[in-house]
């Protein structure tokens, strides 16, 4: 009886600790569901399919950030509860590409439509960092313990990015370039903000600097390739 009570108490404590994260993930899933439902004609999907995809999108997103955190620490078991937002950046496109191929939807449309969903979800994850007290900024010299508001700055960055991307995606202006734009902006922002964030690695450059630089370069490369291929004249078939 004592052992059962101990397990029940541990389960209650664990659930209480996860309640803020679960609420934020629910908010992220709700945003994704509404956004997909509004743009369902672009992907030729029913509204109830949009809800199911929103839930799957959120669950897969959580798995990617946790898996990447476990990977970048050299499979350290102590990092199993950690999250790395770069996991979503690098692994979510795999789901988008596979989903487009399996459902026979245009990949450009899929990436454009799902980019705001990705941005909003990682924004919710960063809000959770504030609530859980992790990913803090460095102390500001001479301020008696006040830290750089790196997490808050990142949330503002996401809001501005959503305000810029969503109207353009709605009006179909980006033509598949939404995700590389997100990669370029996020890579540049994270590379700069990491100089003001605490890290488990001593020195000026953190592990996140590398991932941010890779993200930036990949975004620039993909964006440039898409612009180049769009500007190339199509060859007419000779009869």
Identify the function of each model-found stretch.
Residues 2-239:
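Hydrophobic, membrane-interfacing alpha helices
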